[in-house]
Amino acid sequence: MMKCSFFRAILVAVGLMAAAVVATPANALVTLDIRKGNVQPMPIAITDFLQGDMGAQVSQVIAADLQRSGLFAPINKSAFIEKISNPDASPRFEDWKVINAQALVTGRVTQEADGRLRAEFRLWDPFAGQQMTGQQFYTQPENWRRVAHIIADAIYKQITGEEGYFDTRVVFVSESGTKQQRKRQLAIMDQDGFNVRMLTDGSDLVLTPRFSPNRQEVTYMSFANQQPRVYLLQLETGQREVVGNFPGMTFSPRFSPDGQKVIMSLQQEGNSNIYTMDLRSRTTTRLTSTAAIDTSPSYSPDGARVSFESDRGGKPQIYVMNADGSGQTRISFGDGSYSTPVWSPRGDLIAFTKQAGGKFSIGVMKPDGSGERILTTGFHNEGPTWAPNGRVLMFFRQAAGAGGPQLYSIDLTGYNEQLVKTPSYGSDPAWSPLLE
């Protein structure tokens, strides 16, 4: 097991840069209403941050984050008229209005005497002729990518009014080798596919990793010693432990929103039912009791309800129940079968995998089953996971043929599907909350 201390590797100081940097009220400046669904990407000019290669790299990551969201269209630098030489000074707004830059980002990256990096940025509205916001951050040089993600989040929030999702991690199953000799390891990475680190050595099959709300633990299923069990992995130390030594197979684990429980499936006598385990007392509570396969439980963000998959009606469908197991109600009624339900962090939607007509789709529906929408369909799409702002999903796709699965992201419009490049094949992604 490998140690992973990277969650505490960054030390960021955040603050307004000076009195001149205080943001003007947002209602006087450019905004982007993303509640309307599919929106036209906003043209935004992101200049190379001053002071060498590091500054240019930071601005490139910011631009890539914003472009991948589908809400922003970074303007090609060849169109820039003004060359920013002093990010503290007001830009020539007319030069940016000519190229229709609805927003402008300037900044610099410098190295302090103690070796730390200082990254600062300013966000401008050229058409209002005003600065919108500005911040500065301090960190160790190796964490420059994370600072870029934090800045991208700040820009996203200032313009959309909602939290971003760029300063996050994704835990997933990294797959390598042939189908006959496939090696599967738990891995973790930045949400854009960079900084991949292996968490297990690949000696045991691993499936369905899930983040804890505190970002410090992962629960997953492993076939260690040929015994399929649910485990807890401490990301800081690499220490792992079994979640309950049950006589049958345990699988499909997920944390409760408060991190105090793990909800999972337990297979006994040919049936699979859903249980919770209190992580402090280690007491278990049975929530379902059917002669069927009940699996893939997922809490609502307030912890009051649970969505899950069950074939009690003949084929897999999505059900919702209260957190104590009462009020079990089927909510999926379309053609085909439904699986892997997962509740949005916003509480308004449940994402799912749907199999119909020989193809697999990723879709969303409201918690009462209404408003079903398919976002993408292919040979085999599966395992949706939500970004912490509830605006984007990640999933894995297996194409027909001899290759392996790959990770993709897509927003709720279904029009912004993006490949998330990883060093090897990837499956079973799970998005972290925003980092701190």
Swiss-Prot record:
<keyword id="KW-0131">Cell cycle</keyword>
<dbReference type="InterPro" id="IPR011042">
    <property type="entry name" value="6-blade_b-propeller_TolB-like"/>
</dbReference>
<comment type="function">
    <text>Part of the Tol-Pal system, which plays a role in outer membrane invagination during cell division and is important for maintaining outer membrane integrity.</text>
</comment>
<comment type="similarity">
    <text>Belongs to the TolB family.</text>
</comment>
<dbReference type="GO" id="GO:0017038">
    <property type="term" value="P:protein import"/>
</dbReference>
<dbReference type="Pfam" id="PF04052">
    <property type="entry name" value="TolB_N"/>
</dbReference>
<keyword id="KW-0132">Cell division</keyword>
<dbReference type="InterPro" id="IPR014167">
    <property type="entry name" value="Tol-Pal_TolB"/>
</dbReference>
<keyword id="KW-0574">Periplasm</keyword>
<dbReference type="InterPro" id="IPR011659">
    <property type="entry name" value="PD40"/>
</dbReference>
<feature type="signal peptide">
    <location>
        <begin position="1"/>
        <end position="28"/>
    </location>
</feature>
<dbReference type="Pfam" id="PF07676">
    <property type="entry name" value="PD40"/>
</dbReference>
<dbReference type="GO" id="GO:0051301">
    <property type="term" value="P:cell division"/>
</dbReference>
<protein>
    <recommendedName>
        <fullName>Tol-Pal system protein TolB</fullName>
    </recommendedName>
</protein>
<dbReference type="GO" id="GO:0042597">
    <property type="term" value="C:periplasmic space"/>
</dbReference>
<comment type="subunit">
    <text>The Tol-Pal system is composed of five core proteins: the inner membrane proteins TolA, TolQ and TolR, the periplasmic protein TolB and the outer membrane protein Pal. They form a network linking the inner and outer membranes and the peptidoglycan layer.</text>
</comment>
<dbReference type="InterPro" id="IPR007195">
    <property type="entry name" value="TolB_N"/>
</dbReference>
<keyword id="KW-0732">Signal</keyword>
